[in-house]
């Protein structure tokens, strides 16, 4: 059964002892992933999917006049990296 990023992230958040603020940041990234809507199951994710998502996050932050769109995209990248690395080890 293909695993989605949301399923993997929920399991990751349950497995790790993270602060409430950190959990909320991860959930924010998941909401962005869902809004983006072009994700594939983890087993079929390619570099281009991640790159397109991060570009979308950056462009959205610029359009929303965010104070630091680069930081926003970097945080999303860090969250994806942590969840995907953890999921691939499971």
Name what the model sees in each region.
Residues 10-21, 27-90:
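N-terminal core-binding DNA-recognition domain of tyrosine recombinases/integrases
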Residues 7:
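Catalytic cores of transferase enzymes with a strong primary signal for eukaryotic protein kinases
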């Amino acid at each position: 059964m293909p695993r989605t990023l949301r399923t993997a992230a929920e399991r990751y958040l349950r497995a790790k002892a993270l602060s409430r603020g950190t959990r909320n940041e991860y959930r924010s990234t998941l909401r962005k992933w869902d809004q983006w809507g072009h994700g594939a199951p983890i087993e079929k994710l390619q570099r281009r999917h991640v790159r397109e998502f991060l570009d979308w996050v950056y462009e959205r932050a610029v359009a929303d006049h965010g104070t630091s769109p680069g930081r926003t995209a970097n945080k999303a990248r860090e969250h994806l990296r942590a969840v995907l690395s953890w999921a691939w080890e499971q």
